[in-house]
């Protein structure tokens, strides 16, 4: 049986702390997205946030989740913006939700003037 010295306990604690720090940083390096969905006639806008844009858009398109987007047939992704953290994404989502329809359409027009479904490109 090996005897562990105080020094090796400190080294182990340091290594554990470093591993936890790296894991925490990896979690913070995830990309989060703020997106805007619309319907075929572009009469409805829905603003949302996700960490998996492909999955989330597929959920909207296939009406897998009951609610606003299923009720109003929102199935076209017209705007996507990536954010560095979930906090930034939620703050941006709230900001966009507070905007008028006209301001949201202006934002979309800067990046997607034809209101194409970005998930099909």
Report each predicted region and the residues it spans.
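GIY-YIG nuclease catalytic motif and its immediate N-terminal context
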Residues: 2-94, 107, 111-114, 118-121
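Catalytic/regulatory signature loops of cyclic-dinucleotide turnover enzymes
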Residues: 97
């Amino acid at each position: 049986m090996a005897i562990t010295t105080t020094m090796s306990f400190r080294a182990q604690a340091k290594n554990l702390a470093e591993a936890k720090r790296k894991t925490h940083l990896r979690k913070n390096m995830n990309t989060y997205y703020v997106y805007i969905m619309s319907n075929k006639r572009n009469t409805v806008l829905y603003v949302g946030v996700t960490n998996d844009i492909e999955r989330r858009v597929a959920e909207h398109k296939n009406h897998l989740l009951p609610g606003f987007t299923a009720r109003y047939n929102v199935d076209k992704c017209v705007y996507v913006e990536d954010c560095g953290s979930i906090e930034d994404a939620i703050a941006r989502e709230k900001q966009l939700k507070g905007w008028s329809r006209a301001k949201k359409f202006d934002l979309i027009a800067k990046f997607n003037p034809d209101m194409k479904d970005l998930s099909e490109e």
